[in-house]
């Protein structure tokens, strides 16, 4: 199964044709150090000869720690759909990098001859690396294309959603994924702003929702707004549900 969705648009209004500089960056130094590293990995009760999966490779912190506990017969399969993560892969014959969204867990491992595994780890959320790479559009600080895709050719960008979705859909996104108190206000602000000009950058989005942004909690409000869009763009909740269902079928008793 081809796990890369190649959806390209010709309309210059949207950003699906945008190929960012970050695709060729070496991002090793900008990933955060995993929190509770030993505590989380130790809960896997590593069998040195076992087969393990890291669903969120990122900077490779968890994967390297798991590798340190494996024997020569042990195996680790680490997933990440972000091309930047490939720069962090260890040179280790026990390590296998899977450039894919973890929603394809079972199919990707079966393709590699793996039917069952001894443990699966996921460090969910977004890495500090994504905020540090301002050109990716994950942060509301500064000016950047409104993209937010973990894989830069993977379906719709945040700009596509902001400019295409109706007020009802935007309200659902901001309420469900961002838990914003008044999501309909943010949705209406966006609909009004884009009627004048398309919203293509992070700064333009911040400006569009300025009329409904609480001054005392501006940072918190924008954090929730951007989080909601990121989750929608990348289908994070659907991917997690699929991965959990597949994990139950792949874990050894």
Model-found features: residue ranges?
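S-adenosyl-L-methionine-dependent methyltransferase catalytic core, i.e., the SAM/SAH-binding region
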Residues: 6, 14, 18-253
């Amino acid at each position: 199964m081809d796990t890369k969705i190649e959806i390209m648009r010709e309309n210059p209004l949207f950003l699906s044709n945008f190929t960012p500089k970050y695709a060729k960056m070496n991002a090793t130094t900008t990933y955060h150090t995993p929190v509770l590293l030993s505590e989380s990995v130790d809960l896997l009760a590593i069998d040195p000869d076992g087969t393990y999966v890291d669903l969120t490779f990122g900077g490779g912190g968890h994967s390297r720690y798991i590798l340190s506990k494996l024997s020569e017969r042990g195996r680790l399969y680490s997933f990440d759909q972000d091309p930047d993560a490939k720069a962090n892969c260890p040179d280790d014959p026990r390590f296998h990098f899977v450039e894919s969204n973890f929603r394809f867990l079972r199919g990707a491992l079966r393709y590699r001859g793996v039917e069952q595994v001894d443990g699966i780890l996921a460090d969910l959320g977004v890495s500090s690396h994504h905020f540090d790479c301002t050109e990716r559009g994950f942060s509301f600080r500064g000016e950047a294309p409104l993209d937010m895709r973990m894989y830069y050719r993977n379906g719709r960008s945040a700009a596509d959603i902001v400019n295409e979705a109706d007020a009802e859909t935007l309200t659902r996104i901001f309420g469900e994924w961002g838990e914003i108190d008044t999501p309909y206000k943010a949705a209406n602000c966006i609909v009004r702003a884009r009627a004048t000009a398309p919203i293509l950058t992070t700064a333009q989005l911040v400006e569009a929702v300025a009329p409904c942004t609480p001054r005392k909690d501006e940072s918190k409000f924008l954090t929730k707004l951007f989080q909601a869009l990121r989750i929608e763009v990348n289908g994070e909740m659907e991917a997690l549900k699929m991965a959990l269902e597949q994990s139950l079928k792949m874990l050894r008793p």
